Amino acid sequence: MKSVQEQMAIIRRGAVEILVESELEAKLKKSVETGVPLKVKAGFDPTAPDLHVGHTVLIQKLKQFQDLGHEVNFLIGDFTGMIGDPTGKNETRKALTREEVLKNAETYKQQVFKILDPERTKVVFNSSWMGQMSAADLIGLAGRYTVARMLERDDFHKRFSGQQPIAIHEFLYPLVQGYDSVALKADVELGGTDQKFNLLVGRELQKQEGQVPQCVLTMPLLEGLDGVNKMSKSLGNYIGITEPAKEVFGKVMSISDELMLRYYELLSDVDLAQLQLVRDGVEGKAGGAHPMESKKSLARELVARFYDQAAALRAEEEFVQQFKQKEVPDDIPEVLIDAGEPVWICRLLTDAGLTASNGEARRLVKQGAVKLGGEKIADAGLEVAPAGELILQAGKRRFARIKFLEKK
């Protein structure tokens, strides 16, 4: 096992805040002396079926703890998922059914093991203990926190001040998340910066239970491909970990050098010395790694993580062919459209699978990122005449061959 100082250097990497750092050092010191690993926890509510790399910031930090020899608890919030996390929301979130939550949870398990070692990961569901609670137990838990304390949360405070409704069950969410730490006797809990309040509730509940309070480590919310907004499927600025290898590679290659450095810090396994070479290259210092080569290395690393090394090399070869030689890929999907009335360009993009929604399609057109037959489309209201065959392109990497079928 590495020394406390060596472990802290790895743990600090990319972290926004460690509460309380001296307590974590003491926990690590005891772990080194006794050989007993720390219990490290991170919770994920299965509110959607697929993860993107923004979610993997926490999973990657869990992997670092795992590689340091600690016990990793990947907590699936199947109980909290049915409440709906109110964090950052300006309105009450729609709760999912148990069937939806369990279906999403199954895909989460498959996807996280692209990063975590399944043999050394404990997957736990918080319904295991919350589902056993009686109404009296739940009311007792609710009695441990006041409404005034809950309103210290920025999102609740804004909604209350703006006379927007807050449902009673939303106050239960941070208490249930906090109680998860009591049930697991967690030594460390990881979460995004937006989860800080909930993580500290866990510390407080552990103190009330007579447990040694967990240390809290917050990680930043990863910016999406635009480098501005939080990575989100609804904004179309995401890299999905189940996307085709060539898509993952191409999207990484599209980001700015500054954003690449951020992705290295939060997503990569490279050691601190190599990370410094990447940083020096981005800052233009002598001896630094060339940003283009660094970007390729990062793209290969992520593709290999989600697929394998062979897929990473194939994706790189295709990228070089497609973008260095400005070629349209050979294996683009073919989409058959019945010839008839003209088709709205945004609907065409969505039907072709190039965008997730008409809203995303409209944004891409406005950004000048859509081409039809090699010509840039500037009008989001364009009606495409159904004739022959056309190459439709969204962004730098997404193509479809549109074939209009003649009506008989």
From Swiss-Prot:
GO terms for molecular function: ATP binding; RNA binding; tyrosine-tRNA ligase activity. Homodimer. It catalyses: tRNA(Tyr) + L-tyrosine + ATP = L-tyrosyl-tRNA(Tyr) + AMP + diphosphate + H(+). A motif ('HIGH' region) lies at residues 46-55. A motif ('KMSKS' region) lies at residues 230-234. Its EC number is 6.1.1.1. The gene is tyrS. One of its GO terms (cellular component) is cytosol. This is Tyrosine--tRNA ligase. Catalyzes the attachment of tyrosine to tRNA(Tyr) in a two-step reaction: tyrosine is first activated by ATP to form Tyr-AMP and then transferred to the acceptor end of tRNA(Tyr). Residues 343-404 form the S4 RNA-binding domain. InterPro entries: aa-tRNA-synth_I_CS, aa-tRNA-synth_Ic, Rossmann-like_a/b/a_fold, S4_RNA-bd_sf, SYY-like_C, Tyr-tRNA-ligase, Tyr-tRNA-ligase_bac-type, Tyr-tRNA-ligase_bac_2. It comes from Syntrophotalea carbinolica (strain DSM 2380 / NBRC 103641 / GraBd1) (Pelobacter carbinolicus). Belongs to the class-I aminoacyl-tRNA synthetase family. TyrS type 2 subfamily. One of its GO terms (biological process) is tyrosyl-tRNA aminoacylation. It comes from the Bacteria. It holds the Pfam family tRNA-synt_1b. ATP binds at K233.
